[in-house]
């Protein structure tokens, strides 16, 4: 990704997604209160923002040659679709997939939706990593499906233990930005 595009994405995140307070008022999914909140849906649900994230994340994952990329719904969904689009435009299609928080209660009762086959190499996506628990839930579902997880790829690493928790499971974490770079 061109440095100019990365800088443009960083500016968009700072302007639209990063919320900063004097006191810890933002409750994170981990239950912890924080002074900082990163709401990447303000970027991924915007055409330009989703394109920039798709392009940047594609550049991050493509060297690992995944067959597919996806993660826990809802944060990873637009990122997976954007990567799929950008990868197709580069004549290197990477399939998107979605991991439900729980297996579907009817029909095929799948937890993972996508055109996947056991044994395929997948990149697990995350919008923001804090403790890594959401990413690890997706990793577990992928492994149970028989997929080879090559890494967790995040837009933002909050630098609050997520990297260490993910790496304890033998999975590397790659991120476009660390929270400290955006403050």
From Swiss-Prot:
- Top-rank EC class of the record's enzyme: transferase
Essential cofactor(s): Mg(2+)
SUPFAM superfamilies from the xrefs?
PRTase-like (SSF53271)
Q: Subunit structure, briefly?
A: Homodimer.
Q: Which organism is it from?
A: Aquifex aeolicus (strain VF5)
Q: What is its EC number?
A: 2.4.2.10
Q: What is this protein called?
A: Orotate phosphoribosyltransferase
What reaction(s) does this enzyme catalyze?
orotidine 5'-phosphate + diphosphate = orotate + 5-phospho-alpha-D-ribose 1-diphosphate
Q: What InterPro entries does the entry give?
A: OPRT, Or_phspho_trans_dom, PRibTrfase_dom, PRTase-like
Gene3D superfamilies assigned: 3.40.50.2020
- The positions annotated for binding 5-phospho-alpha-D-ribose 1-diphosphate are 100-101, 104, 106, 126-134
Q: Which family does it belong to?
A: Belongs to the purine/pyrimidine phosphoribosyltransferase family. PyrE subfamily.
Q: Which UniProt keywords apply?
A: Glycosyltransferase, Magnesium, Pyrimidine biosynthesis, Transferase
